[in-house]
């Protein structure tokens, strides 16, 4: 008999890394941890413990629940009830991959709890229904750095040196109009591919020449962001690149050789000086949901791929 409970863990992820839009994302050492329990009363109970947890729906509009149901419907099963208990260190709603983690947690927990036998391609097809950021999906799944370096190619995984880190912050005086525009032309797309390739090379081999990454972020608050870069340099880590994390509002600063003690000092200093409303420090995570949850051993089971995904999409649309 299958277990009635399963524990699932998924890392945070940051997209638009170095300004590469959806061509590069990196897994981070924060995580969403879900204990999912099967029930037979058709009810969903969600307990969520984590920063900004009040933003997380406690009903079947919850992203984990919707992904969970989509996996069941793919196999022609109906939702019969579940308890979700979540402990997360991923801040919700700040462009740090909380939605990506929720999608993977829902799919992985359903796959393992019900023995659905969904293979990797099917899981990605289902995940793409709920999360359009492909780079984040790949980074959170495999860990490390996910990059797409040429048109028509898939995402490659690169292990990231632990010399690197990320300081992520909500600027105190940044423009409220924060957004990342997708690449709109061949020249712009080529730039994103180049940035992705440069990131993969440098973050895996820190002794190689530092590429030109530059800045890609909000227009407002440039003086404050320059002060952040100066603070990092004073702490012994020049900012290698600064960029809007995903769709914002968080701005990320890619760092190198910043010790945990120095990172805490930087966080305190930025808050004290009024340069940021919130600050987090992260390290790369070189493992992801696949390894953490032993998904590599999940054997694919025969199914009509198109039919199953269409059923899941229909369920998502109905929700």
Language-model regions, residue ranges each:
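ATP-binding N-lobe of GHMP and related small-molecule kinases
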Residues: 1-94, 112, 116, 286-287, ...
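DPxDG-like acidic metal-binding loop motif
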Residues: 30, 96-118, 143
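Short beta-strand-to-loop capping motifs
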Residues: 38, 170-171, 253-257
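Beta-strand segments within the central parallel beta-sheet cores of soluble alpha/beta enzyme folds
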Residues: 48, 81-86, 119-129, 211-214
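Short, well-ordered amphipathic alpha-helical segments that serve as non-catalytic structural scaffolds
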Residues: 62-72, 196, 231, 265-266
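Alpha/beta catalytic cores of group-transfer enzymes, especially the acyltransferase/condensing modules
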Residues: 120-164, 229-232, 242
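Active-site rim beta-loop-alpha module in soluble metabolic enzymes
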Residues: 168-223
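Glycine-rich, charge-dense phosphate/pyrophosphate-binding loop(s)
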Residues: 202-319
């Amino acid at each position: 008999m299958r277990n009635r409970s399963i524990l699932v863990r998924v890392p945070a992820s940051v997209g638009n890394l170095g300004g590469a839009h959806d061509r590069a994302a990196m897994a981070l050492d924060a995580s969403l941890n879900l204990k999912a329990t099967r029930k037979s009363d058709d009810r969903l109970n969600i307990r969520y413990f984590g920063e900004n947890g009040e933003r997380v729906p406690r009903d079947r509009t919850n992203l984990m629940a919707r992904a969970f149901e989509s996996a069941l419907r793919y196999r022609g099963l109906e939702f019969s009830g579940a308890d979700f208990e979540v402990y997360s260190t991923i801040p919700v709603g700040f462009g740090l991959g909380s939605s990506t983690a929720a999608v993977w947690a829902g799919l992985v927990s359903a796959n393992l709890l019900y023995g659905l036998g969904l293979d990797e391609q099917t899981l990605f097809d289902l995940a793409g229904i709920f999360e359009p950021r492909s780079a984040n999906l790949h980074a959170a799944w495999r860990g490390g750095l996910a990059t797409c370096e040429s048109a028509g190619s898939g995402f490659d995984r690169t292990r990231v040196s632990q010399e690197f880190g990320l300081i992520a912050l909500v600027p105190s005086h940044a423009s409220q109009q924060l957004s990342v525009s997708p690449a709109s032309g061949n020249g712009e797309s080529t730039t994103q591919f180049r940035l992705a390739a440069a990131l993969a090379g440098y973050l895996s081999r820190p002794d190689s020449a530092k590429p030109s990454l530059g800045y890609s972020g909000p227009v407002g608050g440039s003086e404050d962001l320059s002060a952040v870069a100066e603070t990092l340099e004073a702490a012994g880590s020049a900012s290698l690149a600064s960029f809007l994390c995903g769709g914002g509002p968080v701005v990320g600063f890619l760092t190198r050789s910043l010790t945990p003690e120095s990172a805490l000092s930087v966080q305190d200093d930025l808050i004290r000086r009024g340069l940021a409303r919130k600050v987090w420090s992260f390290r790369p995570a070189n493992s992801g949901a696949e390894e953490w949850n032993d998904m590599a051993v999940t054997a694919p089971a025969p199914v009509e791929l198109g039919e199953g995904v269409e059923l899941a999409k229909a369920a998502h649309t109905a929700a």
